[in-house]
């Protein structure tokens, strides 16, 4: 069904049902990876091994080890690798960062970020055996939950503003509202600490109801 819908938009597009067949094509120079998180590393490494440049949707991978393997493959192959953090291309964010970095707002003493939503992330499933495949964001086997789906945006903005990466983090999360069989938290709270002592906070809930 998804392929049929896509072909309505781009009827002349060539369709592949296996990404490895796409990577074998000499007609392709680069790929865009917008699959669920747990597939990023496998696909990105395979693409670079096949001589393709890669634009990979955020978050990069499930853990630091996987991210490092992707980075080392980029270094070994010389293929361009870019992570799709869309705010890097947003003129509004670019302008604000210019203002921050030129001192318009003074010194950064602290950063507070949040992402609140009212929704369960759940999608309709036509058959029970497809539950974990379709609702992959709800399960730790396939997703890192709010941290990688939403928190990575806020951490990227904070690091961009600070022109540094935090060296300490603490946080906690829980499932307090959507008790529907998922095992990723539906609310989280984190504190990141930079070398100069500035703290970035991030809070997120997906049950922001009234």
Predicted regions and their residues:
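N-terminal glycine-/serine-/threonine-rich beta1-alpha1-beta2 phosphate-ribose binding loop
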Residues: 1-56, 62-80
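Generic structural signal for residues in well-ordered beta-strands
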Residues: 15, 81, 169, 200-202
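Short, solvent-exposed loop/turn segments at the edges of secondary structure
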Residues: 49, 74-76, 183-187, 195
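Short loop/edge segments at beta-strand edges and connector loops
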Residues: 17, 56, 171-173, 204
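Predominantly a Rossmann-like dinucleotide-binding segment in NAD(P)-dependent oxidoreductases
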Residues: 77-83, 87-182, 190
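A cross-domain feature marking catalytic cores of carbohydrate-active enzymes
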Residues: 35, 58, 64, 85, ...
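NAD(P)-dinucleotide binding in Rossmann-like oxidoreductases
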Residues: 180-182, 193-210
